[in-house]
Curated annotation (Swiss-Prot):
<feature type="region of interest" description="Disordered">
    <location>
        <begin position="1"/>
        <end position="70"/>
    </location>
</feature>
<dbReference type="GO" id="GO:0000380">
    <property type="term" value="P:alternative mRNA splicing, via spliceosome"/>
</dbReference>
<feature type="domain" description="Helicase ATP-binding">
    <location>
        <begin position="158"/>
        <end position="333"/>
    </location>
</feature>
<dbReference type="GO" id="GO:0005634">
    <property type="term" value="C:nucleus"/>
</dbReference>
<keyword id="KW-0378">Hydrolase</keyword>
<comment type="similarity">
    <text>Belongs to the DEAD box helicase family. DDX5/DBP2 subfamily.</text>
</comment>
<keyword id="KW-0539">Nucleus</keyword>
<feature type="short sequence motif" description="Q motif">
    <location>
        <begin position="127"/>
        <end position="155"/>
    </location>
</feature>
<keyword id="KW-0690">Ribosome biogenesis</keyword>
<dbReference type="GO" id="GO:1990904">
    <property type="term" value="C:ribonucleoprotein complex"/>
</dbReference>
<dbReference type="Pfam" id="PF00271">
    <property type="entry name" value="Helicase_C"/>
</dbReference>
<protein>
    <recommendedName>
        <fullName>ATP-dependent RNA helicase DBP2</fullName>
        <ecNumber>3.6.4.13</ecNumber>
    </recommendedName>
</protein>
<dbReference type="GO" id="GO:0030515">
    <property type="term" value="F:snoRNA binding"/>
</dbReference>
<keyword id="KW-0866">Nonsense-mediated mRNA decay</keyword>
<dbReference type="GO" id="GO:0003729">
    <property type="term" value="F:mRNA binding"/>
</dbReference>
<dbReference type="GO" id="GO:0006364">
    <property type="term" value="P:rRNA processing"/>
</dbReference>
<keyword id="KW-0698">rRNA processing</keyword>
Amino acid sequence: MSYNNGGYNNRNGGSYGGGYGGGGSRGGRDGYSGGGRGGGYGGGDRDQGGYRGGRFSGGGRGGGRFNDAPRQELTAPQWDLEQLPKFEKNFYSEHPDVAARSDRDIEQFRKENEMTVKGHDIPHPITTFDEAGFPDYVLQEVKDQGFPKPTPIQCQGWPMALSGRDMIGIAATGSGKTLSYCLPSIVHINAQPQLQYGDGPIVLVLAPTRELAVQIQTECSKFGKSSRIRNTCVYGGAPKGPQIRDLARGVEICIATPGRLIDMLEAGKTNLKRVTYLVLDEADRMLDMGFEPQIRKIVDQIRPDRQTLMWSATWPKEVQQLTRDYLNDPIQVTIGSLELAASHTITQLVEVIDEFSKRDRLVKHLESALNEKDNKILVFASTKRTCDEITTYLRSDGWPALAIHGDKEQNERDWVLDEFRKGKTSIMVATDVAARGIDVKGITHVINYDMPGNIEDYVHRIGRTGRGGASGTAISFFTEGNSKLGGDLCKIMREANQTVPPELQRFDRRSYGSHMRFGQGRGGRGGRGGRGGRGGRGGYGGGGGYRSTGGNSAPLGGNRRF
């Protein structure tokens, strides 16, 4: 959590919060731990068993239960725009160098950066940080980070966001989307009236996973410190108490996963009356994970004349419908093609094998990949159990592997990510859900131990490597059970100028008869594969294998592979 005490200065002068979070908030912590923590925490969101322990909604209060607090089902307010306080949202002033560029120059720049735009009166793209028009206090933070130049999505996204328009940004994961909305949000906040006691946030960022939410918070903290902008991260799987305390003190930015935020709203721990800048990050992922009802419930709580920014890696019809419902006359920028495609800097290798061969092939590829000591390998498995089993197997064989999946506690997930980021462990085994939104620099190899259920997830998975123009390698184990992916996988590989192995090409058939034939083949093999897999687990897992966090606690074998 990030909280800055002391005077808060906005762009128009004046101070806010001198002492507001000082002695009073310290007292709140003392009161909270004295009166509340005796009961302990009993989990996270409503579907995880609720919350036990001290109820906190102000300095020093304790006792009671979070679930004992009155809860009110959220209903959509009836908005009267005439009665709502006015607010500023257009802060863009075109730089003279940008204004001087010809239409031909702009068209050429967009073409070189695979940039397409849609809508009317779209601001011209910028090419340098100085052209973006950020105030000095924001610009200095950017320069201090040592970025050489804006990414393509930032070149077009910053002018769009600063103009106050509703906007859609479509670009691959790792393209710089977070800063595309984070920096304009700082300018937006500093132009708004100061928060008063009991006010909710000014900026709300919705994200699909806690890992992505924490990463966004890190960026907001880094670039908001010069303005003393306070933020909090509200997500499930962690105690509610610290999150409630941050909200009670007042934060300008709230980064949240949908389920936990609804918990807070229904319990009256915060409100969205002050939100004038709404961000939906990885909108496609949120919808894939079934968050659409929660998103709609949350957005209905926000004034309709807000500025809304939607960011997505893909453009499926579900995201388009959400856009039509909640964005007003939006402008859109797309980096790359709207057609699903893999990065051309990634070498894609597909091996058509059976289930029994996966472990041996995995070890062979690890031996090759870890010849370079700085390489990082991300291994994807289809289930939490498989994650732990692979990790246990690798560790028993001396490989420095750690697992991350949804059944692990947040502190263990954070630890695994930190070990992987810092290179203390070179192999991380993950499920799709656990890996969504994770941004780890320097991943050199992605191995699909199990293929994903759809081609979109395949592209997202392998996109963890080959970022920022660097090269990467994606290795996939394709079995008969993955035959429905065959045609789409061949198409993705050909588009990226990859060699499609002949064994995979035989699955590139879309007729009903072909699917029936492959389906019948899968049935017979599936039974034998299941029995063999269970036997393998019994052999190394020790009577039933490892559960939950067991894989990460398995000792490293004597044959150290690093």
